[in-house]
Amino acid sequence: MHFENSSYLMLFVSEVVVDSTFNKIPKGLLSPACVLQYNRIVLTRIVPPRDFYYYHEYLAGNPPLEVTEEDFRWRIVGGKRITIQEAPYQVLYGKYCGGTLIAPGWVLTAAHCKTKAGYVYAGSTSRSAAKEYPICAHFIHPYWETSSGHSHDYDYQLLLLEKPIPVTSASRPIAIGSVDDIKNGNIVSVTGWGYLKFKANKMQDILRRVYMPIIDEENCEKMTDGSYDLTSRMFCAGYANGTKDSCQGDSGGPVVYQGKLLGLVSYGLECALPNHPGVYANVPEVRGWIRSVTALPL
């Protein structure tokens, strides 16, 4: 396919900064396809092609469930192995973070995962066998680290992909849930390829999942003696005895309730410590920001 004035467009897009919600396109990834998607979606707000957009038949779903600085970096302990078909919305961002597919061409992850990685990996239970997809642009929430002084407030980052990830049983977007579902005792699932214990220095090759109850703000603050300083963009999940938790390498990964995305792995004190549950970024709370960046009909 030929793109007229593609060199001009690539130069223009590599320098443009529309506002503080995103960073420049990673160097080395400025293909004509990437520039086309960037111009169409970000600059002109034209509706992208069907395969790039958010359609309800694409959305994944699980059946309802019945049941120092380094300490706060990255973020499955006490879980079990699963297949990617059980969490087809899960992707790997770079080497040490997770992410969630919210549309064939969009991934949601944590802002603290930074913007150095140029690829996401999807479609495989095995981390080492996942297919590579280039990132066009990173959009970090403009209030991250500037609003409340909390180092993990507004811990959100959107990734625009160069090409849409094909929708299959192993890679499928997930819908965003309701803020009303973030209730004390609701059981959520957390998935990832992260460490099995703090400072294990080994990512897992096979995807894992753990189930944990949400802990409301009042109980979480009591449990942690107020050390977490929670905001409305955060919620806690875990057990008082610390047997199950997310850990290093899980950051940015999905927290799911009844088949819909509620949160992202954000931070915590080490992993699976008693009385120190994990803290997760509240995704429904920033639905409007996600809509404003992606133009998805959320």
Question: Can you describe what each PLM-predicted range is?
Answer:
Residues 2-7, 11-298:
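Extracellular "complement/coagulation-type" protease architecture
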